[in-house]
Amino acid sequence: MDILETTVKELINTGVETPEGLAKTKRKTSKRQKFSCPDNISLLKTYHELVKKKKVKKYPLLEFLLQTRPVRSLSGIVNISVLTKPYPCPGKCLYCPQESGIPKSYVSGEPAVERAKALHFDPYLQTKSRTKMLESEGHPTDKIELRIVGGTWSYYPRSYQNWFVKRCFDACNGKTAKNLKEAQKINENAKNRIIGLSMETRPDFITPSEIKRLRKLGATMIELGVQSIYENILRINLRGHGTKEIILATKLLKDAGFKVLYQMMPNLPGSNLKKDEKMFVELFKNPDFQPDLLKIYPCALLKSAPLYKWWKSKKYKPYSLEQLIKLMKKIKLKIPYFVRIQRISRDIPSQLVLAGPAKVSNLRQILMEKMKKEGWRCRCIRCREIRDRYSQKEKIHLFREDYAASEGKEIFLSFENETRSKLYSLLRLRRSSENRAIIREIHTYGRQLPLAPTSGFLVSPQHKGLGKKLIKEAERIMKMELKLKKITVISGVGAREYYRKLGYKLENTYMAKSLKN
């Protein structure tokens, strides 16, 4: 018996429950066996092999203790991104790279692109390999948010869309279904449940019929390539649509219950620092916009983009890094409590960026360090997520924010600490322009726990009933304040069973519940 197998069995037999206990048992075993102390990655791999061979019983707590890169599941779920095949896009955007053999707007060298290329852009293989990788690192994969990226999703053939999504579900289900509907039904109780599904598309492709189709696929969030909300800047950059399409798409999506993410691009041709700052103020001042999430991608100057010629002829000049950091600080200080900045900057290899601050790939890290040094705070959801800072002793408070958005009313409910620096759980409730009630999001943050966790040092807001309490409050608001008799939820396929236990029933693609008097 080698040192790895011996150590794993010793850890299980002693019932190790804490990081300190893990380290102590490892040292003790290696000293007794006269071997150097094994690393956690090797131990985790050996543990999985022993479980597979049925030499040891599954011990979830040990998986957590041996977990590598814990940040991957500190938001309460795990994210998996899959890339579509290269396909034309109707857009002719000035800044967009046009690399052969790659979905438009993406470039070789980006991690997701390289993984997809190695697997021939196969959705099943991409989903399967990422799931296996997360499991091998000790992360639970029973709650997955799947993100489909690459080009303009709505422009791909419908047959390809159906096949692509079905194969993602097949990979999570561990079996091949006859059709998409069957694959979704299987996923409701599968080991790896897709509780959220998002796609990228253009605002001018969002129509009532497209929304119905997106729901049939199981989508719960749409990433809109907005980039700018100013007509002249959209026109200069050859976006092919205007502000009215952005406003309409946002309204249609929110009324249908979708979470709406705006991809925004500071430093576009035609803009400047003052305009960019003003734009982010307008995003949350004007009810026509009010996105739930943001991805802020400073314009990257790439040789394969038409913008390259502008730069060569000195018609375009990127911001300096110092200018961008100052701008980003101003933006972050203006973000409301109900918005999550999902990402800042792309994973584009720095050698491909010819000039400008987009060469810096760790912009968010720079901003976080600046925030800490200067003593200011960003109110966005990501900066306030509880992550691994949870303490059972700290008192949790219910907060509520009402705001107008897209001809409707949004009610943002959240459980936070008193100073609102730690966010535990949130719910987005909407009264639509047609006076209907829909829950657009429920999310509890903190270390992701399996659906049937073991007790031990693993303390997390998960499985504490916070989500259920928020749902109960949302139902009370709908019934007592808004006088509505029915509430619906835009549930991910893998989350349907959760809502069934709360009295909700599947109606078309939504979970619905009648509120009795």
Protein language model features and the residues they cover:
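Flexible, acidic/Gly-rich N-terminal and inter-domain linker regions that tether
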Residues: 1-126, 130-175, 337
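Flexible inter-domain linker/hinge segments
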Residues: 41, 45-77, 187, 191-193, ...
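Conserved non-cysteine loop/helix-boundary elements of the Radical SAM core domain that shape
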Residues: 108-126, 146, 150-261, 265-322, ...
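Radical SAM enzyme [4Fe-4S]-AdoMet core and its adjacent flexible, acidic
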Residues: 298-339, 346-387, 451, 457-461
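A conserved beta-strand-loop-helix scaffold within acyl/acetyltransferase catalytic domains
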Residues: 395, 400-447
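Conserved acetyl-CoA-binding loop-helix of GNAT-fold acetyltransferases
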Residues: 456-477
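Conserved GNAT acetyl-CoA-binding A-motif
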Residues: 476-491
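Conserved active-site alpha-helix within GNAT-family acetyltransferase domains
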Residues: 491-510
